[in-house]
Amino acid sequence: MLKKFLISSIVKPTFQSRIIASTTLNGGAGRATFCSVNSINPNPTASQIKVDQEDLEVGEHLVIDDPNQQHIKSFLNGVEFNGKSVNIYRPSRNTMQTGTLRTKKWVIELPFNPKWNDRLMGWWASKDTLNQLNLRFNSETDAVAYCKEIGLNYNIVEEDVTLRKKKKYGHRFRYRGDLVGEKEREVGIN
């Protein structure tokens, strides 16, 4: 049995076509899968909300409360957001794979309630459904504009950039001359 429903408490009525959640119920066991859909306009928030360079800096950002959006910010899907902020980051590459497909989009991770442990079986669970939901955006600017429109405080996490240094193997194969009982010291090799 497949049911589709719209998460109306997470977005404003103008953006209800963006986030669709589908829940699949298999024999009493429920599995929820979420996806983001930008069907009307691929860049809906960038043209409406102005994002400055200060908004894109790494660190915590507080959005000024608007009386019209206070109810959206304080409650989201039945979860209280008092003082909590969302994380905006670019996911890192999986260490088991060499591909970078899932590292190109920016992700908004919503805060969730702590999990509890069932001591008998050792299961970890939570009644919070927001830990299953990640919103993906094409750019950091779109993600920040979305948070500013909804009125959520956000925290931009710094990107992990790996710099590859050129490896030098030539010092291993150079002629060292005749070594008679002396150890040669390799000098100036980085």
Swiss-Prot record:
Where is it mainly found? mitochondrion
Q: Which family does it belong to?
A: Belongs to the complex I NDUFS4 subunit family.
Q: What does this protein do?
A: Accessory subunit of the mitochondrial membrane respiratory chain NADH dehydrogenase (Complex I), that is believed not to be involved in catalysis. Complex I functions in the transfer of electrons from NADH to the respiratory chain. The immediate electron acceptor for the enzyme is believed to be ubiquinone.
Assembly information from the UniProt record: Complex I is composed of 45 different subunits. This is a component of the iron-sulfur (IP) fragment of the enzyme.
Name of the featured protein: NADH dehydrogenase [ubiquinone] iron-sulfur protein 4, mitochondrial
Membrane disposition? Peripheral membrane protein
**Gene Ontology CC:** mitochondrial inner membrane; mitochondrion; respiratory chain complex I
| A Gene Ontology biological process term | electron transport chain
As for subcellular location, the record says: Mitochondrion inner membrane
Q: Which keywords does UniProt give here?
A: Electron transport, Membrane, Mitochondrion, Mitochondrion inner membrane, Respiratory chain, Transit peptide, Transport
GO MF, one term, reads: NADH dehydrogenase (ubiquinone) activity
Q: Which InterPro entries match?
A: NADH_UbQ_FeS_4_mit-like, NDUFS4-like_sf
